[in-house]
Structures are given as C-alpha cells and as structure tokens.
Curated annotation (Swiss-Prot):
Native species: Homo sapiens
Binding site for Mg(2+): 47, 181
Subunit structure, interactors included: G proteins are composed of 3 units; alpha, beta and gamma. The alpha chain contains the guanine nucleotide binding site.
Gene name per UniProt: GNAT2
Biased composition (Basic and acidic residues): 7-27
Family matches, as CDD domains: G-alpha
Stretches the record annotates as G3 motif: 196-205
Name this protein carries in UniProt: Guanine nucleotide-binding protein G(t) subunit alpha-2
Major site of localization recorded for this protein: other
Homology family: Belongs to the G-alpha family. G(i/o/t/z) subfamily.
Region annotation Disordered: where it falls in the sequence: 1-27
UniProt KW keywords: ADP-ribosylation, Cell projection, GTP-binding, Lipoprotein, Magnesium, Metal-binding, Myristate, Nucleotide-binding, Sensory transduction, Transducer, Vision
Coiled-coil segments: none
Modification ADP-ribosylcysteine, positions: 351
Length: 354
C-alpha cells in the first residue's frame, strides 16, 4: 500500500517538475519575445520596413514570391501614369507633343479594358510615348499637388526592363511596390537571441481604430514619418498637410498612457526623396516660421526637433530617432541593429542589470 502511494507521489512530483520546467521555458521565451508595433500615417514606409525584415532576417524573396509581385508592379505603373495624365487636366498643363493628347485618351480606354495586372505591348507603347513627353514630365515635377506613388519614376524610367516577357521582379522592385495595408499584418523573425513579433498597421485614418488591439504588452514602437511629405496633403483629406498629420499622430502616441513604459523609436523615412526635394521646395511651405538654411542637414534637423519636442516626459522618456531610407537594405539593417541594441539595453534596465 505504502509503495503504491510512493509511486504515485513520485509521478506527481515528476509531473510537477515537468510543469515547472515548461512554465520556466515559457517565461524565458516570453522574456525573449519582443512585440514591436510599426505605426505612422499612410504611405510613410511601414510596409517597406516589414519587407526588409523578410530580406534581412528571414530568407528574402524566392523567385516564385518575386513573381507574385509582377501584377502589383504593373498595377502601380498604370495607376502612376493615369494619375499624372489626369493631373494634367486639373493643373491645366498641355502636352508638348500634340499627338500625345490621343495617347492620353487611348491610355484611359486601354486602362478600362485590359485585365488587371497585365501590360499588353500596345499599352506599353502608349505609356512609353507619354512618359517621354515634356508636358507629362512638367506635370510629374508638380507631383506634390496631387496623389502620386513615390515609385512612379523608378518604374516608368525602367519600363523596357519591367515589361520584358521574361521579367522577374528584383528585390528592389518588390520593395518599391505599393499595396495599401488594411488591417494588421504580423511578421515573426529572430535577431540577437530575441524573437520579434512585428505588427504593421494600416496608416490611413480609417485603419487607425484597429490599432488599439495591439497596444497591450508592446516592447517597442517604431514610428515612421516621411520626411519628403512636408509639401504634400493626405490621400483621405486634401486640406491636411501630411507632415502636420504625422506630427499630430506622433504627439498622441508618444504621450499616450498606454506607452508610458514603451521604448519609442522615430524613423524619419524617405531621406533620399527629401534630399532631392529640399533643393527645390523650401521647408517654410510646411513650417512658415522656419527661416534656417534650406539644406538637407538643417531642414532635416528642424523636422526632427519638431517631433522630439512633442515628448512631454523628456526627463524620464528618451525617444530615439534615425534618418532612414526604407528601400535601402543596408541602411535598414544598420538602423534595425541599433534598435535591437536599444531594446536589449532597456530590457536590462528593467531587470536592474544596466
């Protein structure tokens, strides 16, 4: 009788030990899990950062996966040239070559009749002729006055390559492709012994109400703001400047009670586009009080200070900032390494080890 009870006790003790071990393993795993939230206004580059994580920390895009982006890229090309042609009417810009007016009409007819995501030779020729026209180029130069995909010139300048029958999108082509994010997209990867769960949330106003579900237990927020958006208006409200919207959103996030203990990293993104734009468009279009040099460094630092000055708890909460170009893999790799180090440092601080 006694030996039976003893065997039972041993079994219970064994099970208890296994459960303890499992709980400890789960706790260790949980401690090594980093919940990362990507926030920012629409078209600030969040989804491109997610694609970079796949390239840098997973095994990149296979040829089969790249091929799946072909239809998206063709859709982006068509939407871009259509946006420019429609804006010519709105802005009252004439074609340099009168025959291009026929091409403009033909473009609209073809766009309505072709299968989505395809690029028939007839359409390619029409787009090629239009893109070469001086009036179309003049309208492209005024892209801040209407809604145009950032990658428009990247694709249109390489029309021959991307419409070749054997075309396989490169990783750079994939990075520059644009699909509006709706809902929440989760990506998992590991770096420096940490398991990341990265959540990309739609940035347009209609998508933001879905963010609240992701708030609990967030380790770090990466907030993306497009530097180049200082002279642009929102897709969803053409009365609101994109930079002002981004600042308003950042203010509500960095001072939110939910994020009192959350590390916040600011990615001032699209620095490549900003560097080109700042040579032509003065920052005072967005910040009338700005009277500094209209240089990349001075204007960039001014924008950075506009964001960082919104932090009401500077004495206890540091916000880390980086100038980024989300389509540049090396730049993102370097910056994300720095973010990972921040997270490790903050974790050690929480444990009293730093």
């Amino acid at each position: 009788m006694g030996s039976g009870a003893s065997a039972e006790d041993k079994e219970l003790a064994k099970r208890s030990k296994e459960l303890e071990k499992k709980l400890q393993e789960d706790a260790d795993k949980e401690a090594k899990t980093v919940k990362l939230l990507l926030l920012g206004a629409g078209e600030s580059g969040k989804s491109t950062i997610v694609k970079q994580m796949k390239i840098i920390h997973q095994d990149g895009y296979s040829p089969e996966e790249c091929l799946e982006f072909k239809a998206i890229i063709y859709g982006n090309v068509l939407q871009s040239i259509l946006a420019i042609i429609r804006a010519m009417t709105t802005l009252g810009i004439d074609y340099a070559e009168p025959s291009c007016a026929d091409d403009g009409r033909q473009l609209n007819n073809l766009a309505d009749s072709i299968e989505e995501g395809t690029m028939p030779p007839e359409l390619v020729e029409v787009i090629r002729r239009l893109w070469k026209d001086g009036g179309v180029q003049a309208c492209f130069e005024r892209a801040a006055e209407y809604q145009l995909n950032d990658s428009a010139s990247y694709y249109l300048n390489q029309l021959e390559r991307i419409t070749d029958p054997e075309y396989l999108p490169s990783e750079q082509d994939v990075l520059r492709s644009r699909v509006k994010t709706t809902g929440i997209i989760e990506t998992k990867f590991s770096v420096k012994d940490l398991n990341f769960r990265m959540f990309d949330v739609g940035g347009q106003r209609s998508e933001r109400k879905k963010w609240i579900h992701c708030f609990e237990g967030v380790t770090c927020i990466i907030f993306c703001a497009a530097l180049s958006a200082y002279d642009m208006v929102l897709v969803e409200d053409d009365e609101v400047n994109r930079m002002h919207e981004s600042l308003h959103l950042f203010n509500s996030i960095c001072n939110h009670k939910f994020f009192a203990a959350t590390s916040i990293v600011l990615f001032l993104n699209k620095k490549d586009l900003f560097e080109e734009k700042i040579k032509k468009v003065h920052l005072s279009i967005c910040f009338p009080e700005y009277d500094g040099n209209n240089s990349y460094d001075d204007a960039g630092n001014y924008i950075k200070s506009q964001f960082l000055d919104l932090n009401m708890r500077k004495d206890v909460k540091e916000i880390y900032s980086h100038m980024t170009c989300a389509t540049d893999t090396q730049n993102v790799k370097f910056v994300f390494d720095a973010v990972t180090d921040i997270i490790i440092k903050e974790n050690l601080k929480d444990c009293g080890l730093f």
